[in-house]
Amino acid sequence: MAANSGGRSSDADGGPQRHIPVLLREVIAALEPAPGKIILDGTFGAGGYTQAILDQGANVIALDRDPTAIAGGEAMVVANGGRLSLIQSQFSDLAKHAPEDGLDGVVLDIGVSSMQIDEAERGFSFQKNGPLDMRMSASGVSAADVVNRAKVGDLIRIFGFLGEEKQPGRIARAIEKKRAEEPFRTTRDLAGLIEIVTPRKAKDKIHPATRVFQALRVFVNDELGELAQALFAAERSLKPGGRLVVVTFHSLEDRIVKKFFSDRSGKAAGSRHLPMVEDKPAIFENIGKPMIAASDEEAELNPRARSAKLRAGLRTTAPARAADFSIFELPDLASLEKMGG
């Protein structure tokens, strides 16, 4: 899954507002950047969060898997005289780029970037016709590969879980029938079919294709897996007293972050099957409220902020634990490798 001007935006909205990073004030307050500190921005995007961190005197290691974002940030590297390192990398690999003595902070802003949405040739938006691609990097399986090759049952699971689509079976079966005649090549091909199969009703607030496009983007880029790996990598890479700040725009992503901080709080959750579970040392403690949403004022000024949620944790002195992906309760979906051309 990964920007507004700091990182990401929800993909159901319009054009970019790169001068308004979502929850910027709250992110900086949670990170507490200062001279001498090293902060890793795992989702550089257009550099909004990175610039705000640099403005506080901290040094920044910024990552982005998108080569276009890296190229766009080179001027910022030059302008900041060695305090910014900009690296093309998935944020799940952040531990590889952390200094040996650890990081003072990590910020992750999860989702697709405004720049990516704006470029029709990237294929992220049904509002702009282009190749059905959706890859955040330049390699790997595209959305067209998934739509044209995946089994109907796999499409149903992808649309239903990753997109929370209410009629995944109806759409998947229509795709199967249509692709037998000719393959899907463009965003308009897919969006047009979905509009026919599940036409928009007067009460609907979003386009009929919104959830399917979201599901494909999340699947193609393994966004939930990337996020889960990045959280464990941050746990290993932060110094005691280091801060992990994560901004999400969708309930699936927020659920993963919430479960991570809950598991790493050290307070075990018992059940009727296993009522007595031993507490473990806390690896993260909450910073402020467990969850922060955008203010009414920010949501009005920047519609993308309406769905944004911020969660933050303070790294304790407890040693990192083994990465246990079962805590996220993610379903087994189809293999991307089997869908390549």
From Swiss-Prot:
Keyword Heme found: no
Binding-site residues for S-adenosyl-L-methionine, renumbered to this chain: G47, G48, Y49, D64, F91, D109, Q116
SUPFAM superfamilies, alphabetized: Putative methyltransferase TM0872, insert domain (SSF81799), S-adenosyl-L-methionine-dependent methyltransferases (SSF53335)
Enzyme Commission number(s): 2.1.1.199
A matching Pfam family: Methyltransf_5
Keywords annotated in UniProt: Cytoplasm, Methyltransferase, rRNA processing, S-adenosyl-L-methionine, Transferase
GO BP annotations, alphabetical order: rRNA base methylation
Catalytic activity: cytidine(1402) in 16S rRNA + S-adenosyl-L-methionine = N(4)-methylcytidine(1402) in 16S rRNA + S-adenosyl-L-homocysteine + H(+)
Subcellular location: Cytoplasm
The organism's place on the tree of life at top rank: Bacteria
Top enzyme class: transferase
Gene Ontology MF annotations: rRNA (cytosine-N4-)-methyltransferase activity
A GO cellular-component term linked to this record: cytoplasm
UniProt family annotation: Belongs to the methyltransferase superfamily. RsmH family.
Main function: Specifically methylates the N4 position of cytidine in position 1402 (C1402) of 16S rRNA.
NCBIfam families: 16S rRNA (cytosine(1402)-N(4))-methyltransferase RsmH
Protein name: Ribosomal RNA small subunit methyltransferase H
Gene it is expressed from: rsmH
